[in-house]
Amino acid sequence: MLHIEALNLAFPQAVSSEQYLARVAKLVSPLGFAREHSFAAVSVCRDELTQSFLDLVARRWDQPFSLGGLGALPSLGRTGWRAALSHVPQDPDRGHLIVFGMPHIGIDPEGNIGQSLRRHQNEVTPTCGAMAALLSSLRNGFEPLTPGLDDHEAERLRRIVDSQSDQLPDNLLELTKLAAAAVNDEMWVELDALGAYKEMDIAVFCGIQIHLPDEVDFIYPVASAFMGSDGITKALVV
């Protein structure tokens, strides 16, 4: 099938979302991330196609805290981050926070990357739509907004993703990979700024959520790391 060929070519290390989370669970279990002592926070795009990932996370670590906005960039601000950290289960020693950041991309039945054929629609649409709009704005400039409206999330997404590279990405695939790296960086910037490691162990996992037609979603790992009480980031391999 064309979409499977495209997946294997563009994302050779991708695995199903279930397989990915099983690997994550096996990886963090020796670090003390038992279900009863852990709290999950998830940053995915608001697109309805992304929501199944939250359900899968909930099966392993209970209902997660929602961090995400357009492009899966955390959009809750410092106040929201403080709220998330305050929900981490109390443990006799230290809390355990597991964070996921997943920009997403689609592959349509013809194997075209960056498009999805959505439920009850006859034509494919961009996935991620926000990232497609960002790519267009990088090439052609932002359109002026109607008075009374704002686009703060899109502007912030552009600024943070733009900081990842001096080169204009050629396509949505390249831009999505830059976005995943940007999401990972932003996670650690916020967690470091709040000194979260002083009270809890932290594991952050970032990747790309991939939607296939009539198939389970896949995850392409991008970055994974753990930080304990010493405040030192240690890379993990999923």
State what each model feature region is.
Residues M1-F39, C45-D47, F53, D62-Q63, ...:
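Divalent-metal-activated hydrolytic enzyme cores
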Residues L56:
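Histidine-anchored nucleotide/phosphate-binding helix
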Residues V99-G101:
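N-terminal, polar/Ser/Thr-rich
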